[in-house]
């Protein structure tokens, strides 16, 4: 247990609740803990005589869909962006290519959000390093699409050779619409089919066919890799490790047995799994191939009587080999996945393939091979005919094409996973307590700290915690206007000094052996303006509203999104990112299928045991950014009534880090909201002061 100085353990007066006329205050009492004690000055707003005006700490939260992946190192090549485009276009006329346009997405062959540096092709060709975006290059134009989280970043990073397409803005065409507009009818659009999900490739194919364009799969030739040449980073080759059962909660045999029951119910003989976190979760393995995500590059095929892991065997340690052998899992070379798909199809295997995650290369290989099998068996009646199954998703005699059952199972945490998440969050909170006190003292003493200095120091505090492995994404450390860049990543020599006269947004997270954290706080080390306080308070009100939400079972996340935005909406403000994303247990900091977002297409219900972030925000371009983010887990709550006989759900907090009250405009808060803030800080003090 951490040893707290005696003065740190001595509480200030704590009123049972604060009235609207009370002055909310929080005092940092030790470099180890942030006791959330508020002083009730009764009817006056002045400080008591012996009380020093407190500095309060918060951090801000990031968007739900994606935090920045490990950013691409732009110093790896001296090629000018124009030269890269010229070299790429020269390949368009190469024999066997013959295309008019080429699309470069952000993903790797597994549709990962965070990817290894050697697969950051879109970043290499465009110079834009955000985690989400699509580059399209024609013979005379180059355009990049990204969403609202990255508009400002893309403006800074793209050269004049590129057109920035702000996805979602009025009048901005989609990639399909743009291609149909700029290409002459009958054009050929090339893609690497490993980098597109089957669904995405089919959508693209159908859209461009309206102008008689052809989608060309370039299986054996990624054009960006050709021009990247020797400067391209080597593929990762770090060892895999076994994820201990005390953290996993379920052994591999139990997980495989449950999955095979799903195969029987679906009428499938085997399932092909390509999502890296699904493979890691199912096999109780963790890796280090992808920055910030404890996963390894692999494919997995689970049949009724065996399973095959396609992975570079140089990563497999003796412990991992024994672990897999005991679970009945065989090893295969990573690059032999297409050969195995062909072999299974030649035997008439009805494979379960998730079109939203399995890449187009695998899907197309299976469809061609199974068609050949059906033809050779004179089964022409079922050769190409598809049907709709009872879930409303496509399937047929040739295979089962529906969402992977692993995603949902992984999202619903068991008791061991929840315990690990709780414990890791408390250790993380202790590190943040030390960090915030250090930062306050440094700023107070006049230190000139850059945004990178701050991020590095936070990493230093976290790395001292037991079980720490890595950050869970690149720390977003933004002072002033940089805080408005939702996925800002400071760079040495280019970043700003943390300014005590401006808002400072810090969004960070960590990977521990037993859990994954993600927290954002926004703070001010000087005197915030009335505008900053109002915006911050309204973001806080949205955060509180979502935290306190109670809803019937089977409610999808989009239903709750308005809880977090309502206070901002009242004065005509909003934010361009989702409100909440799923979080893995010692896995990816972003995971599905659940989310809390204005995108109402995701009908995944929130279920007891799921973890989501609660991170509303507000951003004024070139001025400041505000986010407040905690992680929550879903649990059943008791209600006096159960309309329709259904259970009702709510949230419990995983994150316990103070929220800076200096930024709160008390006149906007209700008594209930003040109570929430007081109670939360009481919990922070109670839990974190005792944590290890």
Language model features with spans:
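Active-site neighborhoods and metal-handling regions in enzymes and metal-associated proteins
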Residues: 2-692
